[in-house]
Amino acid sequence: MKLFVHNFMSSRFLKNVTVGYPLNLVVKQFVEKDIEFDRDNTIVMLDRIQYEALIVAAAAVNQSDRIPREKPEKWDELTDEQLRVFHHLLMNIDVIDGELICPETKTVFPIRDGIPNMLKVDAEK
């Protein structure tokens, strides 16, 4: 599961959950893949994400020191080198084994072989 995907996931479908975002991320294993950098595509992705959730995800893979704590005001004013760091976090890091945890109910959703399992039994929905 790429960190870009994590940024869009929530547990709002659970009973008694009002926000369910961002899901806490516990990473047991991840791999780094080499996905080709595209400046324009990276800027489009960054315009769509919630920056605070990216900070949380970056911390889960011990990479939070690579990005600024505050969201940059204009993505298109960043250098290619700066954008490559964001691209690396969003697209090159692939969580293979771990957990997503609902911030409200603490329901745990496993990540196995890079696939998050968001299915829950009817009693938990």
Swiss-Prot record:
InterPro entries: Trm112, Trm112-like. The lineage of its organism: Eukaryota, Metazoa, Ecdysozoa, Nematoda, Chromadorea. One of its GO terms (biological process) is maturation of SSU-rRNA. It comes from Caenorhabditis elegans. Keywords: Cytoplasm, Nucleus. Residues 2-121 form the TRM112 domain. It is found in: Nucleus, Nucleoplasm; Cytoplasm, Perinuclear region. Belongs to the TRM112 family. This is Multifunctional methyltransferase subunit TRM112-like protein.
